[in-house]
């Protein structure tokens, strides 16, 4: 081989070597760039993700606090409502008899006036009439409130009558009521005082 050919061959090898080194350097740079790009992108996404999570947590905490405050307000309102209703019930219990007492006051006034008048005039017939009128007024008041007298004719009934004694009487049948010692009353279907009676026993 000639010297010229040898020189050209050596030159070609050197050129190829330099070209290969350049190519390798470019590949290393590209790989490094891709790695940095990926790593950088991952870091960026991580920071963005943390920021997003913090915002969501903050919103949830705010909502929980709002719900808590709303619950406390509702609880306070309910407690106030309960106390108010309890007070109203206490007032109703305290003054439940006010209406009926007010109605009886008129009859009491009439009775006192009738007594005073009879003492001055000695007219006891007028006193009797006055008392009878007062009794009628009282019965009217009771009737308006749903109070009625328990019937005592016929057979003894333990639901409505309270037997305090027995009596053998030919004019009555067995277990019939012979005598009424105290009248009984019902209020709107409920026995508020049974009639006190004597029952016939043969």
Curated annotation (Swiss-Prot):
HAMAP family: GrpE. Residues 21-37 have a biased composition (Basic and acidic residues). The gene is grpE. GO terms for cellular component: cytoplasm. Disulfide bonds: none annotated. GO terms for biological process: protein folding. Belongs to the GrpE family. It comes from the Bacteria. Participates actively in the response to hyperosmotic and heat shock by preventing the aggregation of stress-denatured proteins, in association with DnaK and GrpE. It is the nucleotide exchange factor for DnaK and may function as a thermosensor. Unfolded proteins bind initially to DnaJ; upon interaction with the DnaJ-bound protein, DnaK hydrolyzes its bound ATP, resulting in the formation of a stable complex. GrpE releases ADP from DnaK; ATP binding to DnaK triggers the release of the substrate protein, thus completing the reaction cycle. PANTHER family: GRPE PROTEIN, GRPE PROTEIN HOMOLOG, MITOCHONDRIAL. This is Protein GrpE. Residues 21-52 are annotated as: Disordered.
């Amino acid at each position: 081989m000639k010297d010229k050919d040898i020189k050209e061959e050596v030159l070609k090898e050197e050129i190829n070597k330099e070209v290969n080194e350049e190519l390798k350097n470019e590949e290393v740079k590209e790989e490094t760039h891709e790695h940095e790009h990926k790593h950088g992108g991952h870091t960026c996404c991580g920071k963005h993700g943390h920021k997003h999570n913090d915002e969501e947590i903050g919103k949830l905490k705010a909502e929980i606090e709002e719900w808590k405050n709303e619950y406390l307000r509702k609880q306070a309102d309910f407690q106030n409502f309960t106390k108010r209703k309890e007070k109203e019930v206490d007032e109703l219990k305290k003054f439940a008899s006010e209406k009926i007492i007010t109605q009886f006051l008129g009859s009491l006034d009439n009775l006192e006036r009738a007594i005073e008048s009879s003492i001055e005039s000695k007219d006891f017939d007028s006193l009797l009439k006055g008392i009878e009128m007062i009794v009628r007024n009282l019965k009217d008041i009771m009737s308006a409130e749903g109070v009625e007298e328990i019937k005592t004719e016929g057979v003894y009934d333990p639901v409505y009558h309270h037997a305090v004694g027995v009596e053998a009487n030919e004019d009555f049948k067995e277990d019939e009521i012979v005598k009424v010692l105290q009248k009984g009353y019902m209020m709107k279907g409920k026995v508020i005082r049974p009639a006190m009676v004597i029952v016939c026993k043969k």
